[in-house]
């Protein structure tokens, strides 16, 4: 019934199910993937699983069967645009994207740099993207090319984020802007204490790596971490880092990710924009 209603409402003809998240096991549900509607007829080839999508003025690709969740984190759509605008407005030229996956925030940063240059700002700039998934980084590289950006402005590191942040700090490397968009550290409230320590550690390192006046876009996608707790974690990270800063904006899921009144845990995605005091 829901599948038919979705197709009727959107006017689309195909629907692919990705009910394969680990949380289904906690609820005693079996994993299910495949075509719900519009799949191949007998003897016919399967419809394409590789898609090109448009977000703002950018083109991005995904594989609906193999990528994380839907293949691309659609809930961060508005935050990526906010980041691009921030990079352009402040003419930020040294950007670090941690847990970059397929480079959504990296594309946003490069778009902001290009817009700043076209508006008369200083050209150049480099976006460094870190992830531990080789295939994700390959797609991130492809996204840079797909959008016509200069590959000389894009660096990619197949590495552990925590170790990389510590090495940057040791080497005296600093950045104008940093994105922390890690995977889910706390799937439930039972994991909150351990997750809080992990969030605090990476935020402390990121704040130490920011240039004075630099900007941190930091996120938690853990339902077990409330927005209030996340604020406290980041504030504590700043205190431990010896960094003074301001929260200039709170971020969350895009408007097409609503939350019900009776289920506050549905606000799984929360973000803060922190500017280090100059």
Regions found by a protein language model. Name each.
Residues 135-179:
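S-adenosyl-L-methionine
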Residues 102-124:
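Conserved SAM-binding loop of SAM-dependent methyltransferases across substrates and taxa
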Residues 2-72, 81:
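Non-catalytic substrate-recognition/targeting regions of SAM-dependent transferases
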Residues 114, 210-212:
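Helix-to-beta-strand junctions that scaffold the AdoMet/dcAdoMet cofactor pocket
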Residues 175-205:
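Mobile active-site "lid"/loop adjacent to the S-adenosyl-L-methionine
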Residues 169, 201, 215-278:
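C-terminal catalytic and target-recognition region of SAM-dependent MTase-like enzymes
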Residues 95, 117, 123-131:
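Short beta-strand element of Class I
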Residues 90-101:
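Conserved class I S-adenosyl-L-methionine
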């Amino acid at each position: 019934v829901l599948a038919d209603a979705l197709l009727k409402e959107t006017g689309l003809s195909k629907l692919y199910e990705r009910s394969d998240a680990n949380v289904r096991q906690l609820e005693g549900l079996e994993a299910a993937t495949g075509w719900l509607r519009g799949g191949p007829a007998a003897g016919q080839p399967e419809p394409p699983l590789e898609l090109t999508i448009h977000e703002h003025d950018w083109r991005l690709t995904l594989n609906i069967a193999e990528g994380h969740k839907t293949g691309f984190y659609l809930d961060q759509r508005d935050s990526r645009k906010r980041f691009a605008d921030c990079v352009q407005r402040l003419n930020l030229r040294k950007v670090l994207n941690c847990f970059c996956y397929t480079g959504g925030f990296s594309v946003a940063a490069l778009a902001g740099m290009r817009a700043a240059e076209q508006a008369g700002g200083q050209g150049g700039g480099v976006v460094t993207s870190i992830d531990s998934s080789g295939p994700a980084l390959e797609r991130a590289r492809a996204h840079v090319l797909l959008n016509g950006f200069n590959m000389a402005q894009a660096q990619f590191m197949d590495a552990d984020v925590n170790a990389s942040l510590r090495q940057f700090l040791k080497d005296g490397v600093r950045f104008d802007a940093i994105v922390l968009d890690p995977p889910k550290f706390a799937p439930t409230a039972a994991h909150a204490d351990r997750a809080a320590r992990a969030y605090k550690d990476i935020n402390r390192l990121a704040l130490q790596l920011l240039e004075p006046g630099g900007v941190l876009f930091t996120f938690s996608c853990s339902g077990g971490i409330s927005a209030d707790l996340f604020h406290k974690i980041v504030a504590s990270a700043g205190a431990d880092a010896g960094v003074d800063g301001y929260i200039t904006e709170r971020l969350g899921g895009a408007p097409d990710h609503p939350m019900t009144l009776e289920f506050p845990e549905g606000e799984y995605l929360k973000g803060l924009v922190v500017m280090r005091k100059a």
